[in-house]
Amino acid sequence: MASAHDRAVLQAIFNPTSPIGDVPGLNQEEELMDDDSAFDPELVKQVKDLELQGVSSAESGDLPAALQHFNQAISVLPQRASAYNNRAQTKRLLGDTKGAVEDLEHAISLSNGKGRSACQALVQRGLLLRLSGHDEEARLDFERAAALGSEFARQQAVILNPYAALCNRMLSEVISKLRNPEVSEMQ
């Protein structure tokens, strides 16, 4: 079995653009969860069922039905962040970017920036900010989501960080020279 150091070296060789130390499977943390302990368990179960119905509707292409399920979930338990996050995704798919951002901000606020819903909302908001050309704000959201455990957000934060991009480019060149020393001698 390879050591953590060996896996880190292999990661740097095969994925030179990923952040140094970003080794998939190296940090085997527990999956990020939302804290639902403050809510009535029966209401949480009801809301989760509504959210699953909403996700199922969205996956089958029935976005209006998905939106209706997420609206119902929010009306049952308006203090729970997850349904706002899911509704934001549906609103985005329906072309309502402004409404999506409002729901994402609500999800981040309700979750106190912690847990799975916060992580997902930060990633989604980061993507929307990036699409609208607000790269610095997007990078900040990606960094917060990365701190919560999102590998995708970590990669996006590196891409948007000019210093990290420069370091990764230099590392890629060094690794390329190590792989093909005769090519680098001719240059």
Swiss-Prot record:
Query: What does the sequence similarity comment in the record state about its family?
Result: Belongs to the TTC36 family.
Question: Which residue ranges contain the repeat TPR?
Answer: 47-80, 82-114, 119-152
Please give the name of this protein.
Answer: Tetratricopeptide repeat protein 36
In terms of superkingdom, the source organism counts as Eukaryota
Q: Which UniProt keywords apply?
A: Repeat, TPR repeat
Matching entries from SMART domains are given as: TPR
One of the GO biological process terms: determination of heart left/right asymmetry
Q: Which InterPro entries match?
A: TPR-like_helical_dom_sf, TPR_rpt, TTC36
| Cross-referenced Gene3D superfamilies | Tetratricopeptide repeat domain (1.25.40.10)
| Pfam families according to UniProt | TPR_8
